[in-house]
């Protein structure tokens, strides 16, 4: 193919120029750059024309193959132009409008043209829509009679889209069954005719009701729930049995009203059957008053021994008193339990909320001197001071004498050691130095000055 060789040569020359331009300018050439150089512009133009011709020839060949494959599809192509004429017209149009196309290259292309889901080629100018089914050769159009009349009247050159005919819509409520029941297996046309006739005549429709007689005739009650069955009705009297027999006789009658009234009047709630307990098999008699049941709680005592003990209890008065005391204590305990139960029902006792203690609780001794009368009210102070001094001197002398006595006892080994009584009359009111070792933290002594100040600050 000479066209294919020339196209490849033109393509190579264009690519060489594009690469050189990109190296020199560091960008891809645009349309304005192509139009600046006339030689390059001619190369692009000739390449485009040759490429279009080759594409047209390929499309014609593809179309011929499709026509040979789709012989069954009835497409009216008699009025369309032949392939050769279309190619010639297309070439003429391309040669005439080449300059116009170069000017309008900047415009955007529209969507791809399609018809009946198939992409249209350049030659599919007057493609008529095919019929919906390619397997059946239909006579006339695929629309209604109104469209066929319009097609006969319209000229053959023009093609018009078929219009939809108006169809009377049918409400689903019109297809509901009526009281006049017919055969169930109706066709669709019969149902539609019935709905249209019901719409015209406006017959009142009602909800269908069940046939109670047929239901009662086909009704079968299980044996354990039957009205005549007295297997599980343990508490029924003779009157109820008579009523059940009457119901059984009425069920055999032909009148439906009698059957319904008797069933409604004598309905008995079904009782769930329960399994009866198995009989207890005792090897001995189950009497609770047997001696081995009464007195065999951990000891195998005889009845005679228990009787003798009872006699001894009656004769001994101490045992009787102790038993009575135990009974009274048990009664008191029972009373306490009842009181506790009563209080428990009233609700749990809550501890009273008081002020929280933030400091240490000290032991405060009462001040007894304030309660007594003032002894020095009518006394001479100087005399009292002298008495105190004399007592202090006397105590000191006694203390010194006691120490001297201890020293003499240590020196004389022959004499026996006599233990001094701490509660001796001579030692009363004197300081005991041994006890001073054990006196610690005496902060609450009312005779101390700090304690008195602390009490005054609290007031």
From Swiss-Prot:
One of its GO terms (molecular function) is single-stranded DNA binding. GO terms for biological process: DNA replication initiation; double-strand break repair via break-induced replication; mitotic DNA replication preinitiation complex assembly. Coiled coil: none annotated. InterPro entries: DNA_rep_checkpnt_protein (IPR021110), Sld2 (IPR040203). Residues 82-91, 327-339 have a biased composition (Acidic residues). Its main location: cytoplasm. Residues 140-149, 160-182 have a biased composition (Polar residues). The keyword Nucleus applies. It is found in: Cytoplasm; Nucleus. Residues 79-208, 327-358, 407-459 are annotated as: Disordered. One of its GO terms (cellular component) is cytoplasm. Residues 150-159, 416-429 have a biased composition (Basic and acidic residues). Keywords: Cell cycle, Cytoplasm, DNA replication, Nucleus. Pfam families: Drc1-Sld2. Residues 348-358, 449-459 have a biased composition (Basic residues). Has a role in the initiation of DNA replication. Required at S-phase checkpoint. PANTHER family: DNA REPLICATION REGULATOR SLD2. Belongs to the SLD2 family. This is DNA replication regulator SLD2. It comes from Debaryomyces hansenii (strain ATCC 36239 / CBS 767 / BCRC 21394 / JCM 1990 / NBRC 0083 / IGC 2968) (Yeast). The lineage of its organism: Eukaryota, Fungi, Dikarya, Ascomycota, Saccharomycotina.
């Amino acid at each position: 193919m000479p066209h294919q060789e020339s196209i490849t040569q033109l393509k190579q020359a264009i690519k060489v120029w594009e690469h050189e331009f990109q190296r020199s300018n560091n960008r891809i050439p645009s349309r304005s750059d192509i139009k600046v150089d006339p030689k390059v512009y001619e190369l692009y133009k000739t390449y485009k024309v040759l490429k279009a011709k080759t594409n047209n020839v390929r499309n014609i060949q593809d179309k011929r193959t499709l026509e040979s494959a789709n012989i069954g599809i009835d497409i009216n192509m008699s009025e369309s132009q032949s392939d050769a004429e279309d190619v010639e017209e297309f070439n003429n149009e391309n040669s005439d409008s080449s300059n116009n196309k170069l000017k309008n290259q900047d415009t955007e292309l529209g969507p791809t043209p399609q018809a009946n889901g198939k992409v249209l080629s350049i030659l599919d100018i007057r493609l008529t829509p095919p019929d919906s089914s390619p397997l059946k050769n239909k006579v006339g159009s695929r629309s209604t009679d109104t469209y066929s009349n319009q097609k006969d009247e319209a000229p053959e050159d023009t093609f018009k889209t078929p219009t939809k005919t108006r169809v009377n819509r049918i409400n689903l409520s019109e297809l509901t069954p009526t009281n006049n029941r017919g055969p169930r297996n109706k066709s669709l046309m019969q149902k539609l005719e019935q709905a249209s006739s019901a719409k015209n005549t406006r017959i009142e429709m009602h909800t269908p009701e069940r046939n109670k007689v047929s239901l009662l005739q086909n009704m079968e009650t299980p044996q354990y729930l039957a009205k005549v069955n007295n297997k599980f009705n343990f508490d029924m009297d003779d009157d109820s049995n008579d009523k059940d027999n009457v119901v059984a006789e009425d069920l055999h009658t032909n009148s439906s009203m009698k059957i319904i009234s008797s069933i409604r009047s004598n309905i008995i709630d079904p009782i769930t059957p329960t399994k009866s307990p198995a009989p207890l098999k005792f090897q001995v008699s189950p009497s609770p008053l047997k001696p081995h049941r009464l007195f065999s709680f951990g000891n195998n005592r005889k009845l005679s021994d228990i009787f003798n003990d009872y006699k001894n209890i009656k004769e001994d008065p101490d045992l009787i008193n102790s038993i009575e005391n135990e009974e009274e204590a048990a009664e008191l305990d029972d009373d306490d339990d009842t009181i506790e139960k009563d209080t428990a029902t009233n609700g749990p006792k809550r501890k009273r909320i008081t002020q929280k203690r933030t400091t240490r609780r000290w032991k405060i001794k009462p001040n007894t001197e304030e309660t007594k009368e003032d002894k020095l009210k009518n006394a001479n102070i100087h005399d009292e001071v002298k008495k105190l001094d004399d007592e202090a001197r006397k105590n000191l002398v006694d203390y010194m004498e006691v120490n001297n006595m201890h020293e003499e006892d240590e020196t004389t080994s022959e004499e026996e050691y006599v233990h001094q009584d701490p509660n001796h009359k001579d030692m009363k009111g004197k300081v005991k130095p041994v006890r001073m070792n054990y006196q610690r933290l005496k902060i609450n002594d009312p005779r101390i000055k700090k304690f008195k100040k602390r009490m005054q600050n609290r007031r």
